[in-house]
Amino acid sequence: MAEVANNEQQAPQFNIQRVYTKDVSFETPNSPAVFQKEWNPEVKLDLDTRSAKLADDVYEVVLSLTVTAQNAGETAFLCEVQQAGIFSIAGLSEPQLAHSLGAYCPNILFPYAREAVGSLVGRGTFPQLNLAPVNFDALFAQYVQQRQAAAAAPAAEEANA
């Protein structure tokens, strides 16, 4: 019986407690002049994720998107969205937990953030903006590789000294 209880405690658990919009901002610094120009924008997407432990096995993950559209050398709009979620995560190893917080949870949050950006851009009366899907697994793997390389660099310098 105790063995069954231990197995249940060690089984991975993942629950979404809440998904919410933490912060939004939409600016059209050059309106109404921007509406008079031919629409041929350069759109730039910056994204960031961060997480914080709220309690035992409870984490907040925040996905921040900043979308900037330049048209004819001027900023047409700047849209910022922070989409957040509270997740219960238990029974994972440290690397698995890091992957969940850095890739899996942002993947859950992205469709909500994408919809918020699209809605704000539409309310600004700009043409529809559909953000392409983001491969958070690949971004997280790249982040891990960069951290490993940064950790290896000082060790290599010490070995050469």
Curated annotation (Swiss-Prot):
Keywords (A to Z) from UniProt: Chaperone, Cytoplasm, Protein transport, Translocation, Transport
Record localization: Cytoplasm
InterPro entries: SecB, SecB-like_sf
GO cellular component: cytoplasm
Keyword Cytoplasm: yes
Superkingdom of this protein's organism: Bacteria
Transmembrane spans: none
UniProt GO MF annotations: unfolded protein binding
Pfam family, one: SecB
GO biological process terms held by the UniProt record: protein folding; protein tetramerization; protein transport
Matching PANTHER family: PROTEIN-EXPORT PROTEIN SECB, PTHR36918
Oligomer status and interactors: Homotetramer, a dimer of dimers. One homotetramer interacts with 1 SecA dimer.
Function, as annotated: One of the proteins required for the normal export of preproteins out of the cell cytoplasm. It is a molecular chaperone that binds to a subset of precursor proteins, maintaining them in a translocation-competent state. It also specifically binds to its receptor SecA.
Family recorded in the similarity comment: Belongs to the SecB family.
Descriptive protein name: Protein-export protein SecB
Species of origin: Shewanella sp. (strain MR-7)
Gene: secB
